């Protein structure tokens, strides 16, 4: 499983960022979604982004955010990528990409084969795709729910953009997830927490050790 790149999402403290970076994370994810226990205010996010060392990409996760909200985030926080994790259309993805001049990763929720065409549709506009478990109906959060999907749905498939696997990943199931899907990039949030929004440095280290 050599060379799997890891994004640790939903970091809330500078020590979280340092734990992720020192263990070898390629990306750190900062969440801007008030319903989430991982939500950050702008000043807090700015401090975290500045704590990330060179070479670690800083990603802002938003959910159906307005231009006004995105303007404020991009102005305040030094970023390398935007992650759109709501119901944004390919047209909206293209608008955001053009407006800010930043790469955009679009999340696509998967529960069954009928969800797979969205991956190609969003790939026409986004720079990367995050393939995540579709949240249950009525769920408050679009991601970070600790749920997996049937990895066989994407086994052996190829898309036109780089992609990242998410959804219920832990140090214990990571090797199996990568073996089944062929993922070269993975995203984890709840799988390295001791409680919602509370990252565990030991779990971060174990996850990244497994990814090496």
UniProtKB/Swiss-Prot annotation:
The keyword Zinc does not apply. The lineage of its organism: Bacteria, Pseudomonadati, Pseudomonadota, Alphaproteobacteria, Rhodobacterales. CDD domains: PRAI. GO terms for molecular function: phosphoribosylanthranilate isomerase activity. Keywords: Amino-acid biosynthesis, Aromatic amino acid biosynthesis, Isomerase, Tryptophan biosynthesis. This is N-(5'-phosphoribosyl)anthranilate isomerase. It catalyses: N-(5-phospho-beta-D-ribosyl)anthranilate = 1-(2-carboxyphenylamino)-1-deoxy-D-ribulose 5-phosphate. Coiled coil: none annotated. Its EC number is 5.3.1.24. It is an enzyme of class 5 (isomerase). GO terms for biological process: L-tryptophan biosynthetic process. It holds the Pfam family PRAI. Belongs to the TrpF family. It comes from the Bacteria. The keyword Amino-acid biosynthesis applies. Pathway: Amino-acid biosynthesis; L-tryptophan biosynthesis; L-tryptophan from chorismate: step 3/5.
């Amino acid at each position: 499983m050599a060379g799997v790149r890891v994004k640790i999402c939903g970091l809330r403290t500078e020590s979280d960022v340092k734990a992720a970076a020192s263990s070898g994370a390629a990306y750190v994810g900062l969440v801007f979604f008030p319903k989430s226990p991982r939500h950050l205010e702008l000043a807090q996010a700015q401090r975290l982004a500045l704590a990330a060392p060179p070479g670690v990409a800083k990603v802002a996760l938003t959910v159906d955010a307005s231009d006004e909200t995105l303007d404020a985030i991009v102005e305040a926080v030094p970023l390398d990528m935007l992650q759109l994790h709501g119901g944004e259309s390919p047209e909206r993805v293209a608008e955001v990409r053009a407006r800010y001049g930043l790469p955009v990763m679009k999340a696509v929720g998967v529960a069954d084969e009928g969800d797979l065409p969205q991956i190609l549709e969003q790939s026409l506009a986004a720079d990367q795709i995050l393939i995540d478990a579709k949240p249950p109906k009525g769920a408050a959060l679009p991601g970070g729910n600790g749920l997996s999907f049937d990895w066989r749905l994407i086994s052996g498939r190829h898309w036109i953009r780089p992609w990242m696997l998410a959804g219920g990943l832990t140090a214990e199931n990571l090797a199996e997830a990568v073996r089944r899907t062929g993922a070269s990039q993975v995203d984890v949030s709840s799988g390295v927490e001791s409680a919602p929004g509370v990252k565990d440095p030991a779990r971060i280290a174990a996850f990244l050790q497994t990814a090496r």
